[in-house]
Amino acid sequence: TNELAQARESLARRLQGVDPTDFAALRKAYDAYAENDPLPEMSTMSEIDLGGVSCLGLLPKGCSGDHVILWAHGGGFAMGSSRSHKGLASQVAAAAKVAAIVPDYRLAPEHQHPAALEDIVITYHAILGEGVQPNRIILAGDSAGGGLAVAAAMKLKEQGAAMPAGMILLSPWVDLANRGWSHTSKAQRDPFLTTAVLDTRAKQYGGEANANLSILDADLRGLPPAFIQT
């Protein structure tokens, strides 16, 4: 669509001339690309600390905050932040009439697996510690963040912790080995990503054993129900 083409061109302009190994510059450009995303009317938007993890708290106007979406942002495990995803998270939160919390989890390649996963799980437990009931929490995420949301639910199951009410997963990255047929059949149609880029990000996040982290191969029984949009 024209909108996708414009978005791709805008991001390409932001990244033009940026050294692909300079992650500080890449992240700055990525955040700047999304900084003007429209925001719904907010009661509060504040930086908060939950269990030692820096987060952005988003409370749409008219919401009490006793229901929470915990949003794991996308960005290939190496980019993205609460700033780049505040527009997306706040739009979903406003539509659902709940609060949203977006953690700034540790990023690869400086911090490989399981750092990001640990930060999401820590944030979840901290939200419980604030008195929010588990049946009023949704784990959510887009792209790599969608994979992290599922991985966090798996870790909570392993811990025997109280499970969230459900999950919202937008194009979740669940196969770090990138084995799907669409990597070939739709190679020229994805507006942003290539398989080569995904392979690089997977190795930066999980090292040479990154394929073993693929949620696609995991036992997902006992996880909360999920809404998946691709």
Where are these regions (language model features)?
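A glycine/proline-hinged amphipathic helix-loop "lid/cap" segment
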Residues: 1-61
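Proline/glycine-enriched tight loop/beta-turn segments at coil->beta junctions
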Residues: 60-68, 221-223
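Short beta-strand element of the alpha/beta-hydrolase
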Residues: 66-76
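Catalytic nucleophile-loop/oxyanion-hole region of alpha/beta-hydrolase
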Residues: 81-82, 88, 103-136
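Short beta-strand immediately N-terminal to the catalytic nucleophile in serine-hydrolase-like folds
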Residues: 139-141, 170, 229
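Gly/Ala-rich beta-loop-alpha elbow adjacent to hydrolase catalytic centers
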Residues: 141, 145, 149
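Hydrolase active-site cap/lid region
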Residues: 154-208
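Serine-hydrolase catalytic core
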Residues: 206-230
